[in-house]
């Protein structure tokens, strides 16, 4: 969007959607899972073809690898702030920076090697799907403003370097908002935005 690239306009054909449950499916709360599956059933009634994405073991390490790489990069970027103003940083930020400082060069190289393997495995999916649908979070948005929630289910897409976005998907019994997440192929930003528009219009 910052580049000014318009969303693609899907043709008359409905999308081929891959449901990716992630290795963390059992940790996702019931309202989020139920809302996602119900939305997919509605999309099927509008012509979408939904199929399960097979488990991709190459993607499993990315959830932790992304955190390690991000913490390491943050530790380098905020080295001055850590050294000179450590007491003014939040406990969570200090912990992240210290974890990044402790990450060894060998561990980082291994994380990047796993990332490259995962990117190759992910690229092989796109003969069968137009987009991936997956949970956006483990549950509803947290109440209040103390936290923006757990980023766990976004990390793999960030490290894969592929477009991902979230769409509103109802509310839990407390009235807190739920979301579904869409992911695309590498470089497929415009196509993913176009399919997001189709989903919002269809159901």
Task: Show where each model-derived region lies.
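Structural helix-boundary/capping segments
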Residues: 1-23, 39-42, 46, 109, ...
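Short glycine/threonine-rich loop-to-helix capping motif typified by GTGT followed
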Residues: 30-32, 61-72, 143-148
């Amino acid at each position: 969007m910052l580049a000014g690239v318009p969303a693609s306009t899907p043709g008359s054909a409905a999308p081929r959607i891959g449901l990716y449950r992630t290795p963390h499916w059992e940790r996702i709360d019931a309202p989020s899972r139920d809302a996602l599956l119900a939305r997919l059933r509605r999309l099927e009634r509008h012509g979408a073809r939904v199929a399960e994405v097979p488990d991709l073991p190459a993607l499993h390490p990315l959830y932790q690898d992304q955190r390690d790489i991000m913490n390491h990069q943050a530790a380098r970027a905020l080295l001055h702030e850590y050294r000179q103003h450590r007491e003014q940083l939040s406990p969570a930020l200090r912990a992240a920076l210290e974890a990044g400082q402790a990450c060894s060069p060998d561990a980082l190289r291994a994380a990047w090697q796993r990332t490259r393997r995962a990117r190759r495995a992910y690229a092989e999916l796109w003969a069968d799907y137009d987009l991936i649908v997956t949970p956006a979070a483990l549950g509803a948005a947290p109440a209040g403003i103390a936290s923006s929630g757990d980023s766990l289910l976004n990390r793999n897409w960030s490290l894969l370097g592929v477009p991902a976005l979230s769409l509103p998907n109802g509310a839990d019994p407390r009235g807190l908002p739920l979301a579904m997440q869409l992911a695309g192929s590498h470089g497929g930003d415009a196509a993913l935005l176009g399919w997001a528009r189709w989903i919002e219009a269809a159901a």
